Amino acid sequence: MMGPEIERLVGLMARLPGLGPRSARRIVLRLMAEREQRLLPLIAALDAACQRVAVCPVCGGLDSQQPCMICADAAREPLICVVETVADQWALERAAVYRGRYHVLGGLLSAIAGHGPEDLGIDRLVARLDGSVREVILALPATVDGQATAHYLTERLATCGVSVTRLAQGVPVGGSIEILDEGTLALALSARRAAG
């Protein structure tokens, strides 16, 4: 039998993606058994992240500095890669084949979910196209909502004076950017094509 504090902690852990009740119990037991080595450093790291990490007002990524390190890096190429989530941005950064900037939508257009263009920061993206950006790369999932979002963005950006491209094959239909291995991401990014 678990006390209320442990039960609450297990319940919160089980709500994390990829964790069920059994995994959550094992994690909580390990954290409690190794309080000094694991639990206290985790608490400190979570507290620091909660206090310092915020959404970048430019790209929508996460960082402890504002604007984020990527947006502030003048050595980045004049490209913007549009992704659905921060996890997708991190996956592309891990692949180390892209040196431009990002725009994180935070979702996709979806009539069923009630997400329209105003919910995705698309106006912020258009405002960033000030003449210094030469290409917008749409790195969106190959799902119905991803395709609809890519189509909308292609039409919306057609008059902005930038080349709009999409990732090439290698991203499976129904697949998510964040789960792809670095080799697949590198191939898809290097073989991108014009959208539309």
Swiss-Prot record:
Keywords: DNA damage, DNA recombination, DNA repair, Metal-binding, Zinc, Zinc-finger. PANTHER family: RECOMBINATION PROTEIN RECR (PTHR30446:SF0). Residues 78-172 form the Toprim domain. InterPro entries: DNA_Rcmb_RecR, Rcmb_RecR, Rcmb_RecR_Znf, TOPRIM_dom, TOPRIM_RecR. This is Recombination protein RecR. May play a role in DNA repair. It seems to be involved in an RecBC-independent recombinational process of DNA repair. It may act with RecF and RecO. The gene is recR. The lineage of its organism: Bacteria, Pseudomonadati, Pseudomonadota, Alphaproteobacteria, Acetobacterales. GO terms for biological process: DNA recombination; DNA repair. A zinc finger (C4-type) spans 56-71. It comes from Acidiphilium cryptum (strain JF-5). It comes from the Bacteria. PROSITE patterns: TOPRIM. Belongs to the RecR family. GO terms for molecular function: DNA binding; zinc ion binding.
